[in-house]
Amino acid sequence: YVFADFDWLKEPRLIGELSYESLRGSDSYGFCYKDEWLKDYGGLFLSDDLNNYPGQQYTTPGKDIFGCFSDALPDRWGRTLINRREQILAKDEKRLVRRLSSFDYLIGIEDFSRMGGFRFKESMDGEYINASESLHIPPLTDIRELIAASSEIEKSEEEDQLPEMRWIAQLVQPGSSLGGARPKASVIDENKNLCIAKFPSRKDDYDAGLW
């Protein structure tokens, strides 16, 4: 179930249902608007590949997830964190590494820090996916520890080795939702605002933060 939690809504509203199917390594997605959403917000187009009418709609063959949801997907840094977490878990559990889809990336991101205004549930009366009463976004005062963790992860990438789980665990929730390739994480400042902290990279040949 897909909910809109846009800043101009008084409370989250159910938009529709997103479905996902993987067959022989090929992913397909379906979406169906709820009648109530179309009645109240039928003039609002969420994506150029979704028409505002009732009934099931599907992504075209060879196309990934609908555009409005792809905007919330992590970029290279976030995908690296999620991929490495899956590889470490697979090693610990003595199983094959799962091929992660856009759907896995979408729901693998922490609910509070996910880019955009979409929220997801597996059942109408359930909790939002990957949401927790204990906020997983660290305070700004943890910045040095986060920088150290990002440096260790970059080092392991250079050496083509898996990082320690403690470094991934420290960054995967606050860092996986953000775009771009540079190491970064979401943090909460002293005024409880959600901010983006960009870190130095081992690949930097100048002080990118100072620039």
Where are these regions (language model features)?
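Phosphate/dinucleotide-binding and metal-coordinating scaffold of catalytic cores
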Residues: 1-211
